[in-house]
Each structure stands twice: as structure tokens, then as C-alpha cells.
Amino acid sequence: MNKILTENEIKKFKEDGAVFLEKKFDINWINKLKTGIEKDISNPSPRFKSHTTKKNVPAYLEDYWTWHLIPEFKEFVYKSPYAQIAAELMSAKKINLVMDNWFLREAGSKSSTPFHHDISYFDMDGTMCVLWLPLQPTKKNEGVVWVRGSHLWNKFFLRVLFKDGHKIEGNECIVNGKKYELPPDILGNKDKYEFLQWDCELGDAVVFDMRTLHGSLNESIPDKTLSRYTL
């Protein structure tokens, strides 16, 4: 089987905690995922939610664990290049699917993504990576940013709710021998961190370590609806 990634891309992922992958996904996959989201919105799972608290305004929507419910998502899980990409990034012989989800931010939505790392939302250990696949061309200021090297801090942070207000869930504590701390104030101390961010065309993606902090750096309001699919 031919390799998909270069050694430099793998090195970037391991050292920086996130890597930009150019044109790894055919436009047909993008269209299938967009169709899948449309189907999901018209017939959502019990886990579907809006993170926007106000009613009758542009919203920030999400659904997850729906790959087995939406044929387009299931096909992507089994047949897209991502399983091989993940295996190459993590030097793994076998890849397990932990979670699938999608986010859609409607044009004009004032809701944003809080800074968080995904590892806090899962009660498991192991080496994990996450796909961030935009389904529309996305400029740097329209997507999320990643805090370079934060996956190597050897820290766990409390979960942050995506709903407007971004409430931190719980208090500092030790769970299963791991200390969970308050998330750092990234937005209030932007000069202390180095951020990774990219303009993405269709077919481009970012893959990041489950421990890498990421979120919205500014409060830009999109003038078009933006969606992304993650695994």
C-alpha cells in the first residue's frame, strides 16, 4: 500500500500537535459529507444540539455518534483515506473509531468554539488523533486555531461546554490518578502562545493530537454557513 503522508507531515504532527494536510480528500467525499449533514439535520439523532442559547438567530449546531445512521458518514468511515492517514500519523497497525461528529455554524452566528482539548471528553487512554475536515473553503479567521505543542504539556484540563457562555464543567480534581486543571485563559494571554492556523480549500484538512488545545481565536461572524466533519 502506497504511503499517503510524507515524513515531514508525520514529524509536524508529533512535534506541533497538529498538521495541515493539503488535498488529501477528493471532492466527492466533501459532497457526500455535506449531504450526510443535510440528512442528519432533517432527521437528527437524540444527541443533536444547538450551542446557541438564543432562539430564532443563526445557530451553531452539532450531532455526534451518527456514522451508523447516515450512509454517507458510514461510507466515509470505511472507505475514505482517513483510516490510513491516522495509522501513518500514529505508527499504528490498527485504528479504532472513538467518535464521529459534525459542526455547522450558520451564516451570522455569534456562537464560537471554546478553547479545550478533546481528551477531557473521553474516559479512555491511548494515542488518539482527530480529523478536522472543513466542507467549505475556510479562511484562517473563520476556523479554529491550535496551540502549538500543547499536547506535550502533560496536563489535563476540565471540560468546557460549547454552549454560549462556555461554562467550565466541574472543579479542579483528581480522577483515576489524573489531575484535571482549569483551562488556561488563552484569549486573555494570546501573546504567550504560538498558534497554528491555515486557510483551507476543499479537500484540505487538519489532523491534531487529542491533547492539543484548540478553539476560536477571534469572534469573527461568518458571512456564509460553515460546516466541518470530524473523526
Give residue ranges: language-model regions.
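Short, charged/polar surface micro-motifs in flexible loops or helix N-caps
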Residues: Y82, A92, A107-K110, Q136-K140, ...
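Non-heme Fe(II)/2-oxoglutarate
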Residues: I41-K55, R159-D164, L202-V207, R211-L231
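A short hydrophobic beta-strand segment most commonly corresponding to one strand
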Residues: V130-L133, R148, K224-L231
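Acidic, His- and aromatic-enriched active-site or binding-groove loops in soluble protein domains
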Residues: H117-W132
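Short, structured patches in soluble enzyme cores that scaffold and shape functional sites
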Residues: N101, H117, L133-P137, W146-R148
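Non-heme Fe(II)-dependent double-stranded beta-helix
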Residues: M1-D16, E22-F115, Y121-F122
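Double-stranded beta-helix
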Residues: K140-L213
